[in-house]
Amino acid sequence: MRKYFLGEEFTKQDLKQMNPLVLAYIGDAVYEIFIRTYIISKNKDTCVNKLHKKTIQFVKADAQSYFIREIQKYLNEEEIKVFKRGRNTKSNTSAKNASIQDYRMATGFETVIGYLYLLNEDERLEEIMKLVINLYEESSQNEGENHGSKS
């Protein structure tokens, strides 16, 4: 599908020259599609409003900031550089419901996702998505256990 729309595939050099916010822009959309697909696969008979609320738990800036902090140790050198470029790029938009630090971390995360997507690194993208989903599921289980012990 990408090849049809892009014509030519992007090279690493092309992406190094691209504004990191452009990579984050596409990364935001790619990440959301992955997460929505995951949420739907686990909640087939749920109304759209509830699906949206579950999706927000993954896509809000503080969640993305948490995920990138946790998975950073699994990123290779190139991905770390891409992340830092995205995180450190000055943006004209501001965080609505997040700290500046979380917003920048989330932008770095989305930059990595966009970079991998435009390079057609689908296997690597899936590995990162699995790490994120596993982190979410672990934190949800821990939250449930903590709530259970309070009563």
From Swiss-Prot:
InterPro entries tied to this protein: Mini3_fam, RNase_III_dom, RNase_III_sf
Keyword set, alphabetical order: Cytoplasm, Endonuclease, Hydrolase, Magnesium, Nuclease, Ribosome biogenesis, RNA-binding, rRNA processing, rRNA-binding
EC number(s) from the headed UniProt entry: 3.1.26.-
GO CC annotation, single: cytoplasm
GO terms for MF: ribonuclease III activity; rRNA binding
Cofactor: Mg(2+)
Location relative to the cell: Cytoplasm
GO biological process: rRNA processing
Cross-referenced Pfam families: Ribonuclease_3
Highest taxon of source: Bacteria
Catalytic-site annotation from UniProt: D28
Subunit structure: Homodimer.
Record's function text: Involved in correct processing of both the 5' and 3' ends of 23S rRNA precursor. Processes 30S rRNA precursor transcript even in absence of ribonuclease 3 (Rnc); Rnc processes 30S rRNA into smaller rRNA precursors.
Family: Belongs to the MrnC RNase family.
Name by which UniProt lists this protein: Mini-ribonuclease 3
Gene: mrnC
